[in-house]
């Protein structure tokens, strides 16, 4: 199963703030963590839209960020492991290498330890840049990337 990924993080190689994955049929995973000391750009562009997304069905009112919705890294790891269990194998598609790096860091739970996953392959593509409905929101950015990729395929452009 192909899965498109986007992350938000606190500056170049900074701490993960949010992680989103969307599969070919639209099934999604979205979790976010507190960012107590954001860099200026993150404070202005990422935090205001953290936790805002279009819940299914399309057209429903956006959910709003609430402190009770924040996740710890460990809880994100457990939830991600459970989410990935639905697949026999997963091909991760990203538009930026840091998204892959952040995802791989989430897989690691300690020295020599990691969450259980199906077999994973990864691909980074610059041609999937897309403007999402909520820019700098990882879930909406992943949804937009998926939509662009599938539209390119349908049009025979890939």
Tell what function each PLM region has.
Residues 3, 8-94:
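Conserved non-catalytic scaffold segment of RNase H-like nuclease domains
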Residues 9-11, 98, 144:
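Short, glycine/acidic-enriched loop or turn micro-motifs at the edges of active sites
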Residues 12-14, 101, 147:
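Conserved protein kinase catalytic core
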Residues 22-23, 107-112, 154:
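Short, surface-exposed basic-aromatic patches at helix termini and helix-loop junctions that form
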Residues 76-80, 99, 145:
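Alpha-helical packing segments of well-folded alpha/beta enzyme cores
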Residues 96, 129-158:
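Acidic, Mg2+-coordinating catalytic module of metal-dependent nucleases/exonucleases
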Residues 98-117:
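Substrate-recognition/cap helix-loop segment adjacent to the acidic, metal-dependent catalytic center
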Residues 114-134:
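Short, flexible loop segments at boundaries between secondary-structure elements
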């Amino acid at each position: 199963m192909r899965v498109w990924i986007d992350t938000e993080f606190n500056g170049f190689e900074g701490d993960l703030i949010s992680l989103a994955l969307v599969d070919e049929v639209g099934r999604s995973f979205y979790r976010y963590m507190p960012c107590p000391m954001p860099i200026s750009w993150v404070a202005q562009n990422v935090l205001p839209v953290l936790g805002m997304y279009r819940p299914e069905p399309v057209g429903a009112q956006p959910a709003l960020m609430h402190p009770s919705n924040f996740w710890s890294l460990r809880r994100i790891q457990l939830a991600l492991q459970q989410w990935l269990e639905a697949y026999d194998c997963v091909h991760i598609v990203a538009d930026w290498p840091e998204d892959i790096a952040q995802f791989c860091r989430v897989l690691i739970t300690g020295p020599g330890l990691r969450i259980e996953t199906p077999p994973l392959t990864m691909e980074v593509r610059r041609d999937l840049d897309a403007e999402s409905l909520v820019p700098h929101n990882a879930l909406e950015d992943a949804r937009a990337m998926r939509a662009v990729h599938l539209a390119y395929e349908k049009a025979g452009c890939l």
